[in-house]
């Protein structure tokens, strides 16, 4: 039989019944993404992924156009059925197949391999047959939109998308006018790409204004596409193997066998394709997409900072005084324009966060059987507290082209880029009590005027009625030895006699200029015994020095614990020097020339100088070594044993540096009695206001010399220690005096009390 005649018969069997339907018009606007759930399993396979529309959408999506809107109308449709496949009895009436297809089936044999099926059948003819479908023509307008660009151009992406939808809906009414306006928007914004297509079906009489003449498979709710596996036309013994081969081709790209066990399916990779389970191309696309989403997240924050609402908010902030986080928050909440812009940012970042999470879940799901481990971190949302801190940094840490981060607790900037030029002058704090009433016009960091009851002194506000010269009659806080820190360091290096304080060395465990074993705790004290010898003075420590000699090749490094009693008392009434903490200095170790001796120096300076009566020094080595203890605990040790003597050290000199302040105990005791008397008489503060102010000033100046403490903890109360040990007051008298001063400070002066911790 002639082959052309056989082909005509087969065509008549396949395209059975034809019916003509009127044309229709459908708009379709959807947010479509390249990868849907399980879409990677069939990526780059089948006719759909090689179609013109899909490839166009993939390319647009990679360019940033994540939203597709399509309005189209179909016309001249025919419903077709494959009547040959509908036959139930394929044995008596076999399907008329092409000779080439029949020859390919015969070449398979009875037990073909998966690769034979793929190369011979699947790659040539596919995996499915068309059972029924709809043919026709289509006229469509497709818009690809980048919502992020629309948001930046118009300020509201939702309204812009709706306006474009309304404009596109008039395409079939006024095609030329609609296309002209859309092209103007495309050129001016770059946020949309417009494509129009007109495809006609085979058999139409008129092909005018058509881009192509070909059959179009239409698919809608009314016109569904029905497919069936190609195995139905194979012999019985080949059907199961064909299904396995088709699944291996679709799911594993022909690089392995598709197997299912325990409700889990995977690809059993061939030796030449060990990574067949890993869709590396899709993973790279998702990683690139996540990187772009992270950039878009950062750009959203920059867009808010560059917006007109944020800039106008920054301009309206007052610059004549310091703004705390709380005051900035108040201005932030009162700016309605900024609030509406901030809500848009929150909604945009929330939508972006959900997209990132969905993409990240897909990415990690694809990487389950990959050697490639994805590294992705979800961008952190900037909280309102971080926004306020950002505003503060823009106000005070944005100078000379540099920028940094502002720390409100320290009122300073941490500049980025290893520079200190980003900090602007920090304005003064305006408030009540000892805060400024107005900042200085000449130097905004200093006070220009003070509140009632305070006077301006060196840019600070101090209580107006305090006579500092009168308090000097009680304790001479200001002396000729108030040197600068550099001067003090120079005088300590020279061992200046003016800073030499005569103390008494006391120790039952150590003798000066005698070697001892430091691996056991040793204690020594330096005391003044002012209550017996120098009752008219209190003493200030500004530094310490020790000369320690070690045996040759010694590996020990001694460690010191120093406790200070400010005004005598027991050991429990002392405080420990926090070396290296809270800005407190450390010991400086300098080796002496041509000797095994070292000078250990501690310079407190003006910042950390404090009162002292007795200094307790505990010495211990930094390493634990085998027990070699001097049983006597005193006297010279045996240095003849080389295994022992390398651990011994000796202290040849211990010295405290400082100066003494004149202290009028009788005059101060009489002032304290007046304070105590006013408290017991029912708070008659007005009659003794000068004494109250004087005692408040003395208490403040004494407690100001207290040692540093951890942030959030109260300072030590040195004033009460002075009342107890130098004025010999009882605990009840000390409580009454402090309570009277606190009442006067809060009720009369309207100042807040500073919390202190009990030491004595």
UniProtKB/Swiss-Prot annotation:
Tissues of expression: Expressed in brain. Expressed in GABAergic neurons of the pre-frontal cortex. Weakly expressed in embryonic stem (ES) cells and in ES-derived neural stem cells (NSCs).
Induction text: Up-regulated upon differentiation into neuronal cells in the presence of retinoic acid and BDNF. Up-regulated upon differentiation into astroglial cells.
One Pfam match: BRINP
Gene Ontology cellular component annotations, sorted alphabetically: cytoplasm; glutamatergic synapse; synapse
Keyword Cytoplasm in annotation: yes
Residues spanning the signal sequence: 1-16
Residues modified by glycosylation: 156, 433, 443, 553, 599, 630, 676
Keywords: Cell cycle, Cytoplasm, Glycoprotein, Growth arrest, Neurogenesis, Signal
Origin: domain of life: Eukaryota
Subcellular location: Cytoplasm
Domain MACPF: 68-251
Gene Ontology process terms (BP): behavioral fear response; brain development; cell population proliferation; cellular response to retinoic acid; central nervous system neuron development; exploration behavior; gene expression; homeostasis of number of cells within a tissue
Family according to the record: Belongs to the BRINP family.
Task of the protein: Plays a role in neurogenesis, brain development, and the functioning of GABAergic neurons. May suppress cell cycle progression in postmitotic neurons by inhibiting G1/S transition.
Protein name in the entry: BMP/retinoic acid-inducible neural-specific protein 1
């Amino acid at each position: 039989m002639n082959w052309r005649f056989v082909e005509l018969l087969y065509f008549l069997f396949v395209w059975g019944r034809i019916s003509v339907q009127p044309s229709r018009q459908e708009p379709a606007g959807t947010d479509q993404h390249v990868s849907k759930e399980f879409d990677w399993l069939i990526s780059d396979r089948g006719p759909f992924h090689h179609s013109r529309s899909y490839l166009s959408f993939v390319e647009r999506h990679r360019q940033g156009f994540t939203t597709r809107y399509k309005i189209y109308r179909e016309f001249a449709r025919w419903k077709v059925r494959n009547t040959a496949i509908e036959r139930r009895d394929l044995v008596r009436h076999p399907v008329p197949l092409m000779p080439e297809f029949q020859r390919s089936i015969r070449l398979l044999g009875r037990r073909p391999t998966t690769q034979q099926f793929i190369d011979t059948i699947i790659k040539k003819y596919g995996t499915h047959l068309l059972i029924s479908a709809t043919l026709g023509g289509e006229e469509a307008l497709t818009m690809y939109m980048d919502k992020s660009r629309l948001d930046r151009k118009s300020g509201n992406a939702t309204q812009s998308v709706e306006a474009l939808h309304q404009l596109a809906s008039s395409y079939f009414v006024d095609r030329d006018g609609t296309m002209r306006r859309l092209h103007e928007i495309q050129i001016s914004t770059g946020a949309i790409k417009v494509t129009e297509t007109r495809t006609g079906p085979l058999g139409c009489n008129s092909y005018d204004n058509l881009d192509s003449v070909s059959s179009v498979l239409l698919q809608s709710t009314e016109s569904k596409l029905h497919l069936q596996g190609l195995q139905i036309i194979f012999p019985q013994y080949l059907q199961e193997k064909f299904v396995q081969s088709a699944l291996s081709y679709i799911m594993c790209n022909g690089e392995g066998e598709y197997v299912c066990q325990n409700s889990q399916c995977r690809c059993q990779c061939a030796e030449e394709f060990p990574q067949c389970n890993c869709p590396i191309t899709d993973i790279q696309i998702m990683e690139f997409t996540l990187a772009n989403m992270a950039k878009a997240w950062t750009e959203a924050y920059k867009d808010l900072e560059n917006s007109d609402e944020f800039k106008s908010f920054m301009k309206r902030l007052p610059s004549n005084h310091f703004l705390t986080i709380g005051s900035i928050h108040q201005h932030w909440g009162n700016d309605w324009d900024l609030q509406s812009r901030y809500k848009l940012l929150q909604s945009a970042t929330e939508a972006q966060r959900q997209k990132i999470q969905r993409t990240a879940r897909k990415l990690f799901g694809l990487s389950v059987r990959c050697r490639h481990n994805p590294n992705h971190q979800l961008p952190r949302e900037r909280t309102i507290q971080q926004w306020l801190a950002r505003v503060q940094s823009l106000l005070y840490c944005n100078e000379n082209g540099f920028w940094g981060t502002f720390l409100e607790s320290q009122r300073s900037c941490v500049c980025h880029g290893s520079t200190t030029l980003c900090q602007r002058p920090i304005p003064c704090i305006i408030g009540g009590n000892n805060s400024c009433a107005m900042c200085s016009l000449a130097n905004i960091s200093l006070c220009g005027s003070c509140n009632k009851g305070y006077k301006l002194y060196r840019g600070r506000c101090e209580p107006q009625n305090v006579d500092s010269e009168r308090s000097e009659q009680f304790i001479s806080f200001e002396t000729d030895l108030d040197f600068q820190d550099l001067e003090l360091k120079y005088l300590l290096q020279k061992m200046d006699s003016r800073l030499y304080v005569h103390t008494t060395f006391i120790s039952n465990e150590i003798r000066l200029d005698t070697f001892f074993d430091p691996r056991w705790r040793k204690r020594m004290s330096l005391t003044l015994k002012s209550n017996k010898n120098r009752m008219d003075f209190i003493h200030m420590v500004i530094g310490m020095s020790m000369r320690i000699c070690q045996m040759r090749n010694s590996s020990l490094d001694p460690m010191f614990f120093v406790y200070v009693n400010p005004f005598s008392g027991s050991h429990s009434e002392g405080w420990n020097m926090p070396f290296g903490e809270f800005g407190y200095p450390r010991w400086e170790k300098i080796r002496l020339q041509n000797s095994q001796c070292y000078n250990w120096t501690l310079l407190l300076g003006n910042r950390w100088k404090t009162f002292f009566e007795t200094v307790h020094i505990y010495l211990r080595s930094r390493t634990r070594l085998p027990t070699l203890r001097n049983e006597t605990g005193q006297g010279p040790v045996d240095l003849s044993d080389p295994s022992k003597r390398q651990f011994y050290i000796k202290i040849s000199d211990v010295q405290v540096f400082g100066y003494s302040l004149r202290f009028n105990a009788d005059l101060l005791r009489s002032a304290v009695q007046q304070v105590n008397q006013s408290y017991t008489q029912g708070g008659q503060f007005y009659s003794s206001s000068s004494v109250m102010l004087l005692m408040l000033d003395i208490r403040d100046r004494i407690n100001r010399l207290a040692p540093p403490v951890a942030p959030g903890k109260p300072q030590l109360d040195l004033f009460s220690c002075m009342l107890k040990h130098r004025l010999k007051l009882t605990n009840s008298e000390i409580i009454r005096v402090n309570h009277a001063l606190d009442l006067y400070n809060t009720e009369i002066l309207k100042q807040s009390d500073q919390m202190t911790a009990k030491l004595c």
